[in-house]
């Protein structure tokens, strides 16, 4: 399928060069100009962490794939990461999670961060609060008016 008029077709060449003299990997992006796509790529790379996020339930510690996390939310003083079937406690604060999580995760209220890749639908209500529904679960969260537009933009970027 050819891009429509006004749409740029973005091609990115990826090359890995091994250099045993280096202490740590380095990523260099060369481009004729800075685009939104390159800025997002840079942000995504910078957010990648080698340290896995630990989740806790009862006396067990779990290392879950972030792709399985629907959302993080506060409940009193605790923060929970929700999968479609379970809720696990995490030790980080929401603002710390915002720094650690990949670009697919987006703040939608004072108490919730959502995984945009897991969103099935977004229902807007007359009261101004919208509801997020997820794939294959009954769990829902609410988007505050303040964060609604940010979420819509993130969802459009992820398409």
Q: How would you label these PLM feature ranges?
A:
Residues 5, 37-136, 140:
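Conserved binding/recognition cores within well-folded domains
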Residues 142-143, 149:
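C-terminal structural segments of small proteins and small subunits
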Residues 55, 146-147:
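Intrinsically disordered, low-complexity N-terminal regions enriched in serine/proline/glycine
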Residues 4, 150-159:
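Charged phosphate-binding loop/patch that engages nucleotide di/tri-phosphates or the phosphate backbone
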Residues 1-39:
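N-terminal regulatory/sensing modules of transcriptional regulators
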Residues 137, 148-150:
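Short coil/turn motifs at secondary-structure junctions
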């Amino acid at each position: 399928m050819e891009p429509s008029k006004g749409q740029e077709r973005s091609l990115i060449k990826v090359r890995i060069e091994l250099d045993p003299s280096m202490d740590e990997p380095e990523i260099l992006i060369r481009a004729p100009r800075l685009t939104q796509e390159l800025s997002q790529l840079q942000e995504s790379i910078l957010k990648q962490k080698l340290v896995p996020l630990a989740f806790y339930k009862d006396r067990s510690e779990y290392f879950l794939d972030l792709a399985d996390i629907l959302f993080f939310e506060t409940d009193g003083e605790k923060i929970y990461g929700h999968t479609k079937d379970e809720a696990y406690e995490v030790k980080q604060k929401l603002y710390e999670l915002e720094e650690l999580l990949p670009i697919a995760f987006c703040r939608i209220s004072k108490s919730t961060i959502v995984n945009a890749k897991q969103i099935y639908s977004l229902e807007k209500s007359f009261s101004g609060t919208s509801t997020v529904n997820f794939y294959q679960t009954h769990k829902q969260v609410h988007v505050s008016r303040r964060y609604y537009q940010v979420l819509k933009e993130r969802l459009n970027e992820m398409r």
